[in-house]
């Protein structure tokens, strides 16, 4: 789907079986970054944001490991990459209510150091959405003047939001950020909620 990109996977070494790590390392376009430490204090959902500070990285796209790629995402990303906009946001389901979904955005390299910002910001140990809180409160204002936003719902920015290249109905109501479930019934529940969003 993204042949010019390398997939960086951040793993908590004590929690992931060595066999899994070894299997992932067999892919030539995959880089494994092993992390350690307490999962509460280390804030693992933020690890993936560190990539944009790497000197070899010009463009970073943050995705959840348990979500699928669909062509509607690919088309939207292509539109952004061809533009002069620095930051890309996607919201494609009624449940995508955050300004920036942690696994549905992209950013081009600028002078901004994300790691420095993350080190400065205190995150509540109890919240499960600390990554999206950081993105909304710290990152969003910094890139506010250079956004491309593909949004099917929650168009907070009004006319600045643009539609995805084609309708959900053309893809059986699949959506960007859709999770991978072994039980297709759960997938159907999510798509039914998407359909209700149009009613």
Predicted features along the sequence, with ranges:
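A short, glycine-/small-residue-rich helix N-cap motif at loop->alpha-helix starts
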Residues: 39-47
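A short acidic, amphipathic alpha-helical/loop segment
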Residues: 19-23, 51, 73-77
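Short aromatic/hydrophobic "clamp" motif used to bind/position activated sugar donors
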Residues: 60-62
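N-terminal anchoring/stem segment of glycosyltransferases
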Residues: 1-38
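Catalytic core and acceptor-binding pocket of nucleotide-sugar-dependent glycosyltransferases
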Residues: 94-97, 104-199
């Amino acid at each position: 789907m993204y042949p010019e990109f390398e997939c960086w996977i951040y793993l908590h070494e004590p929690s992931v079986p060595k066999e899994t790590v070894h299997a992932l390392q067999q892919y030539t376009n995959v880089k494994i970054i092993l992390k350690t430490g307490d999962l509460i204090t280390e804030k693992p959902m933020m690890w993936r944001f560190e990539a944009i500070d790497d000197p070899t990285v010009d463009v970073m796209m943050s995705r959840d490991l348990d979500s699928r790629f669909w062509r509607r995402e690919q088309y939207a990303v292509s539109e952004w990459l061809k533009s002069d906009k620095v930051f890309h946001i996607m919201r494609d389901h009624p449940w995508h209510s955050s300004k920036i979904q942690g696994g549905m955005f992209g950013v081009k390299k600028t002078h901004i150091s994300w790691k420095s910002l993350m080190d400065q910001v205190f995150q509540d140990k109890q919240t499960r959405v600390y990554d999206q809180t950081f993105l909304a409160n710290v990152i969003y204002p910094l890139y506010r003047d250079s956004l491309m936003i593909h949004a099917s719902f929650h168009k907070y920015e009004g006319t600045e939001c643009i539609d995805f290249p084609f309708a959900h109905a053309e893809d059986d109501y699949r959506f960007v950020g859709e999770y991978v479930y072994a039980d297709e019934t759960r997938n159907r529940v999510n798509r039914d909620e998407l359909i209700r969003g149009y009613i």
